[in-house]
Design a protein with these regions (language model features):
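Acidic, glycine/proline-rich low-complexity segments that act as flexible tails and inter-domain linkers
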Residues: 1-57, 110-122
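Short acidic alpha-helix initiation/capping motifs at coil-to-helix transition points
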Residues: 38-41, 71-77
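Structural motif
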Residues: 52-58, 88-93
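Short, structured motif recognition centered on aromatic/hydrophobic residues
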Residues: 59-67, 97-98
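Substrate/cofactor-recognition hotspot
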Residues: 60, 107-108
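A short structural micro-motif
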Residues: 68-69, 87, 100-107
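Extended intrinsically disordered, low-complexity coil regions enriched in Ser, Thr, Gly, Ala
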Residues: 73-93, 109-121
Length: 122
């Protein structure tokens, strides 16, 4: 896939998942770390998110699980919780995703994610 095609797919995926917030992230990087914005658009959202085997709901569920597990990624986790809602996950599915993480990452990280989600739902 050519760069322009990846960029086109990336912009479409980013808009579907993150709405205007995603565009704001890319614009904020422009002039400071524009290459990172390009990698986000072309690689993450242009290539990875456009693979066929998983739908966007599954991809966002995986993404929030990874971000929750890492810790220290609260801004990105908040964006992807909203992205999960945008692609059709509901609050119950997001909470169940968090609960599934408890045995593997512990209550503190899960409670932090619940707090972010709760504030995002309101």
């Amino acid at each position: 896939m050519e760069v322009e095609e990846r960029r086109k797919f990336g912009l479409k995926s980013l808009k579907t998942i993150d709405g205007e917030v995603g565009d704001e992230v890319i614009k904020a990087l422009d002039g400071v770390a524009g290459d990172i914005g390009n990698y986000i658009l072309e690689f993450a959202f242009g290539e990875i998110y456009n693979r066929k085997s998983l739908n966007l709901k599954h991809r966002e569920m995986i993404t929030i699980t990874i971000l929750l597990s890492q810790g220290g990624t609260e801004p990105q986790l908040k964006v992807h919780i909203n992205g999960a809602l945008n692609v059709g996950l509901n609050q119950e599915e997001i909470l169940e995703t968090f609960i599934q993480c408890i045995p593997y990452v512990g209550f503190p990280k899960v409670l932090n994610a619940v707090d972010l989600a709760k504030n995002g739902y309101n």
